[in-house]
Amino acid sequence: MATTTVSPGSPGAAWRRVGAFCLDVLFPPVCGGCGRVGVLLCPACVVRLVPVAGPICLCCGRALDRAADIAGGLCRDCAATPPLLAQMRAPLRYAEPASSLIHRLKYEGCFALGPALAGVLIDGWPRWPSPPDLIVPIPLHPRRRRQRGYNQSELLARPLAAAVGVGYSATALQ
């Protein structure tokens, strides 16, 4: 996915703002969580997003609820078979409205939700126990990438890495 950088004060940036305004008038954004017209992620749905909190697996980021797991710092799965990646994090529990937002991003082609969800990741960044050296989107199978036309995890990982000042690589896992 190629990106073009346009300086904020340039004529190109002004035309992009005009174009975005026209698109919003013709096709107003709709909240991915509840369908409210006018915004991609409404304040009511943002409030309903449940962050992963409390003790989490130091490897995969899954919530730990057993005393034995909490003491060891790893969930049962990671203790039995450690993943190839050193750290993975899920900032939200996969419950409504997060599950609807992710479904719309992945399967309904609503890639405009990418920046809104990336904002949720950026807001949750201070809760992450240790910052990684590199942020890497999970690659899609080439056939799936052709079908969708984009990798939804890239839409989240790239702006997160830029906002928090951590390196980014779309090809590290390929």
Give short role names for the model-derived ranges.
Residues M1-Q174:
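Glycine-rich phosphate/pyrophosphate-handling loop used in enzymes and phosphotransfer proteins
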